[in-house]
Amino acid sequence: MKGKFYESEYEKALIDLLQAEGWQYTNGGNIHRQLREPLLIEDPKVNDLRVYLQNQYPDLADSDVTEVINYLRHVPGQSHFERLRNTFQLVRDGYRYTRHGDGVNFDIRFIDFDNTDCNIFRAVNQFEVAYGMKNDVRIPDVLLFVNGIPLCIFELKNPTKLDADIAQAYEQIHTRYMRDIPHLLRYCPLSCISDATDNNTRLGTTYTPYEHYYAWKKVNNEDPSAQKGIDQVRTIVKGVHEPSRFLEILRDYVYFPDEKSGREEEIVCRYPQFFATRMMSDSIRRAFKEQTSKGGTYFGATGCGKTYTMMFIARQLALRCKELGSPTVIMIVDRDDLQTQAGKLFLRSQDFLQLGTVKVISDREELKTELSLRDSGGFFICTIQKFCESIGELNTRRNIICFSDEAHRTQIRLSSKIKVVEHKDIEAKVEQTSAGAVAVRIIDESK
């Protein structure tokens, strides 16, 4: 009983933290529903998806709202991964619904990302999900619903029991739940495992390998890194699950490769990638406004996921920086094997990037031609050798953004132009130097 008491107390403490950040709380046992139905659509008192859609689209009849809900419930896919990816993209991007009778179109959005207060955020524990011929049930510890859609699953382990740890929490989600209640997990892009001990509260996805679950140790970039177990629980709630931050991460920092790639992987950003993306995007926008042509420099430790950070930045520039007018991005690498490595990732990420054509460039003339054919969009990968003074300017358009991967190898005199600010753990700071360049240094010692 003692162990059970402590586990239930931890669950309650987590819910209290979520409530403090703006999540409504409901005990799953008080929600009247068919136990196989993961969406909150049946109980008149907890009918979040229908209520949200009726509030957002008052011109739709009840029958139309039911049809929209059923469209979400029956997203196709030949495998669990395909259904997860397709469902997530529908929830994130919405779709166009044509009303019966008059043919009027409605752009349905299951989440209002631009207006956080228009959404319904609900934390639920003891949420039974039935499966099998005998209607056995699984009960995830805590589920986070946005507008009645379960988008994050928490699995907790007793902090006081030595034989219960986050590896078991991982197995619970990735083996037992995936096997028994995939009809719930098809909606859940995010998962969190925790036993409230040091470095054991970690964020991932339902397709993240155990070793790649990652602690989120800062609420804001300038904060000190959380070191103690309960502090890390508070930090992940404030840094990931605060409603507006939660929507920001869902919108732009959850990555699936293109369907045609055939790869089954789902990635959520780590917190240094999140803060670096924010800072670099702001720096690029500032440089564009001030016409300095100096977007910034980002330093990351080996293995910290710099290529994914560049992908997150590119998506931000494409979708969230309207003043750039859908820029063209050129990724410059300094050797052919990097060109191949980076090219493979970006070539299978066209849907995520939202920049149109993604292409590896073979020579200078091809790059010049591609730039001349467009006023916006496009993502091109090429080596530094494609550039030389003899060919002159390739293009004078202002909204061409160049990423230089492993740039320190080709910028021998970098120190004469920028000042690097170093901080312990994971810290990112921007400093303007006399030469006008911006340096961002991230040192990763947190894993």
Go through each PLM region and give its residues.
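Conserved motor-coupling elements within RecA-like helicase/translocase cores
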Residues: I361-F380, E393-R397
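ATP-dependent helicase/translocase motor core
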Residues: K2-T328, D337, Q341-L353, D375, ...
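Conserved D-loop-proximal element of ABC-family nucleotide-binding domains
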Residues: I412-R413
